[in-house]
Amino acid sequence: MMQPKKTKFRKAHKGRIHGVASSGATLAFGQFGLKAMEPERVTARQIEAARRALTRHMKRAGRVWIRIFPDVPVSKKPAEVRMGSGKGAPELWVARVKPGRVMFEIDGVNQQTAKEALTLAAAKLPIKTRFVARIAE
C-alpha cells in the first residue's frame, strides 16, 4: 500500500476539495487514461485494488502509471470511545482528487483492452470516471 515515508505533521485537517484540477488534467505518459469526474478522497487501498485490477486484465503487458498519491492522513477514534480527549490516531492515507484529474494511465495495449481494464479499475474507485485517449498524431 502507498503512503509517505515521512511527513511534516502526523495529522491533517479534514478540509474540502474545491475547484477543478489544473495540473494533472491531461495525459502525460500513456496513450489511455482514467479521469475523475467528481471530487472525492481516494484511499490507498482503493488505489491498490484498482492497480491490481488493471494489471491483471492487461496480463502484465504494457505499462501502468499511477498519477495520484495518498499523502493525507485520516485519523479515527477506536470503537466505543467517548467523544473528546483529543483527535484519534492516524488510521489510513487518502489522496484528495479533484474533478478532471487523470488518476491512471496505461500504454502498450490496444484501445479495447485499455478500455476494459480501466473500466474494471473504475469499479474499484468511489468516484465517477471517464476513459480518455490521446489523439493520434
Swiss-Prot record:
UniProt keyword annotation of Cell membrane present: no
Gene Ontology BP, a term: translation
Gene assigned in the entry: rplP
Species of origin: Rhodopseudomonas palustris (strain HaA2)
Protein name in UniProt: Large ribosomal subunit protein uL16
SUPFAM superfamilies, alphabetized: Ribosomal protein L16p/L10e (SSF54686)
Subunit (UniProt): Part of the 50S ribosomal subunit.
Sorted UniProt keywords: Ribonucleoprotein, Ribosomal protein, RNA-binding, rRNA-binding, tRNA-binding
Pfam families with a match to the protein in the record: Ribosomal_L16
InterPro entries xref list: Ribosomal_uL16 (IPR047873), Ribosomal_uL16_bact-type (IPR000114), Ribosomal_uL16_CS (IPR020798), Ribosomal_uL16_dom (IPR016180), Ribosomal_uL16_sf (IPR036920)
GO cellular component, one term: cytosolic large ribosomal subunit
Biological role stated in the UniProt entry: Binds 23S rRNA and is also seen to make contacts with the A and possibly P site tRNAs.
Family membership: Belongs to the universal ribosomal protein uL16 family.
GO MF annotation list: rRNA binding; structural constituent of ribosome; tRNA binding
Source species, domain of life: Bacteria
